[in-house]
């Protein structure tokens, strides 16, 4: 399931860097984290859904790449974001 539009807007509002920001690494990572959390809950009841599990692994990889990029350009923003989202390093 895709994110509900209201929840998506909340995340964009919370993590945006300026007024019209929707594509900064912080916003993208927050949206991916929300989708990953949803799929993780989905797999607790649908253990054999291997097709969606592959999608989850792609999302995790994409989030990891964005976090690596953010860490390379600004260590402080990276640390703040992983603390706010509760992501392991």
UniProtKB/Swiss-Prot annotation:
CDD domains named among the record's database cross-references: Ribosomal_S15p_S13e
Pfam family, one: Ribosomal_S15
InterPro entries (UniProt xref): Ribosomal_uS15, Ribosomal_uS15_bac-type, uS15_NS1_RNA-bd_sf
One GO term of the biological process aspect: translation
GO cellular-component term (any): cytosolic small ribosomal subunit
Keyword field: Ribonucleoprotein, Ribosomal protein, RNA-binding, rRNA-binding
Gene3D superfamilies the UniProt entry points to: 6.10.250.3130, S15/NS1, RNA-binding
S-S bonds: none
Coiled coil: none
Domain of life: Bacteria
GO MF: rRNA binding; structural constituent of ribosome
Function of the molecule: One of the primary rRNA binding proteins, it binds directly to 16S rRNA where it helps nucleate assembly of the platform of the 30S subunit by binding and bridging several RNA helices of the 16S rRNA.
Family label: Belongs to the universal ribosomal protein uS15 family.
PANTHER family named among the record's database cross-references: RIBOSOMAL PROTEIN S15, BACTERIAL AND ORGANELLAR, SMALL RIBOSOMAL SUBUNIT PROTEIN US15M
Quaternary context: Part of the 30S ribosomal subunit. Forms a bridge to the 50S subunit in the 70S ribosome, contacting the 23S rRNA.
Protein name: Small ribosomal subunit protein uS15
Provenance organism: Anaeromyxobacter sp. (strain Fw109-5)
């Amino acid at each position: 399931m895709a994110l509900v539009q209201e929840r998506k807007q909340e995340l964009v509002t919370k993590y945006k860097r300026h007024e019209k920001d929707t594509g900064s690494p912080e916003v993208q990572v927050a949206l991916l984290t929300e989708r990953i959390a949803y799929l993780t809950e989905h797999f607790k009841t649908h253990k054999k859904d291997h097709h969606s599990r592959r999608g989850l692994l792609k999302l995790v990889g994409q989030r990891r790449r964005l976090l690596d990029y953010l860490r390379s350009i600004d260590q402080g923003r990276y640390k703040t974001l992983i603390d706010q989202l509760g992501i392991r390093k």
